[in-house]
Amino acid sequence: FGVQSVIVSFDVVETKQGEYCLYARNGMLKRMYEKKVPVLSKIKLLDSIGVGEYLITSVEREGTLKGLDLNLIKSTSNGTSSPIIYAGGASDLEDISKAFSCGAHAVSAGRLFTLHGGFKAVLVSYPKRSDIKSILNDKL
């Protein structure tokens, strides 16, 4: 096993001051000991001890289909060479493409692919392979 087998997951909430803070229990509990620690500082610390990948979830956007937090992606992806997977709010394939342009290595999307129509009925659907290839710039 290598460093890629060690993944740390963060639940993140943006404060009124525009700072991204680590939260627990779906954003209901702010970690008191991390009150003043920006997410990027924590990533740098974890990089130094060998964490190989991160999963960062924007709690406020999770399940909303209102778009990924592109500011969060830009601010965290530039601070590490480790891959980061982003979750929370993916609204369509264009939104995922924007995330890649901002530095995301991968994007997690649940509701985008399961709930459809006016009644938000469960209907698992996937984009066409050609659409995926265009987002990934024909890397497949």
Tell where the protein language model's regions lie, with residue ranges.
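Conserved anion-binding
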Residues: F1-L55, E60-R61
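Short, hinge-like loop/turn segments at secondary-structure boundaries
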Residues: G2, A24-G27, L72-K74, C102-A104, ...
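A cross-family glycoside hydrolase active-site/sugar-binding cleft signature
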Residues: I7-D11, T57, I85-G88, S108-G110
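Short, well-ordered secondary-structure micro-motifs
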Residues: G18-L22, L65-G67, I96-K98, F119-K120
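Charged helix-capping and loop-helix junction motifs
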Residues: K36-L40, K66-S75
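Short Gly/Pro-enriched loop/turn and capping motifs at secondary-structure junctions
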Residues: E60-E62, A90-L93, F113-T114
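Catalytic cores of alpha/beta
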Residues: N71-A109
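C-terminal helical cap(s) of enzyme catalytic domains, especially alpha/beta-barrels
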Residues: I96-L140
